[in-house]
Amino acid sequence: MDNTPDQGSLKAHTLHPKSVTDRLAIHPDLTRRLLVDFIRQEVRKFGFNRLVLGLSGGIDSALSATLAAEALGPENVVGIMLPYRTSSPESEGHARLLIEQLGIQSDLIDITPMAEPLFEHYGGELSNLRRGNILARLRMVAVFDRSAAENALVLGTSNKTEYLLGYTTWYGDSAASIQPIGDLYKTQIRALSRAVGVPTPILEKKPSADLWPGQTDEGEMGLTYDTVDQVLYLLVDERLDPQYVVEMGFDEALVSRVVRTVRNNQYKRMTPIIAKVGSRTPGIDFRYPRDWGH
């Protein structure tokens, strides 16, 4: 999104929508092995050997759990189902299907008693978005607490499309110790999930954060993953100027919206900014590798 015109023009003439789809294609086995090794190395690097994650019944958490079970063994992975009273029974059923297939440890925590007092306090002023964010943050409270009890790290389940668009709850579902699938677009998640044997009902369902009855990701965003992933790939990975993405045949309003959304949500991808007062400031000039001291 910050290319010079000449660079963008050159790429625009060498890329076409079909080739974008081809470039988004992944090598499933290589990607699987890379992510399994990543999970195993990162968890053990910090002296842990167990992971806890929230299981929504969706494809992202299903893939994450599958990779974690291969990396650490199913006995070292704990999947937590965290329904609210309006959550889809189908989602819980899909989560249980995955748990049975993988043989991982599991638990169910109904977050309704946690959420209702807060919802009652705010009354009718709460929008669906605010309610959904509250539920996402309550779920992460439960998952992190369970990780402490298990002496485990929290496994993230966010994908690259969500990160770039900011389609995530800050300090909710985006909060985790490691994020193995964070550099895979949603369409790539589908391909890898199919390759590693995620159950068919999960593969075929419409993506949904299950934040309120009938909610779907694509319906809420007003975008399809197939299209938005191509636009994001061109803007981010290929670093094309937005105008050249339009010249390739993508809708101008869509491209403009994606650019605006990515830029407006940059703050969600950053750690909190610290005001510099002293001579060495964490995150500015006091910076060491994450495994410093281990």
Language model features with spans:
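Conserved G/P- and acidic residue-centered "switch" motifs that form tight phosphate/ATP-binding loops
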Residues: 58
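ATP/NTP-dependent adenylation/nucleotidyl-transfer catalytic domains that generate, transfer
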Residues: 2-53, 63-70, 75-89, 93-294
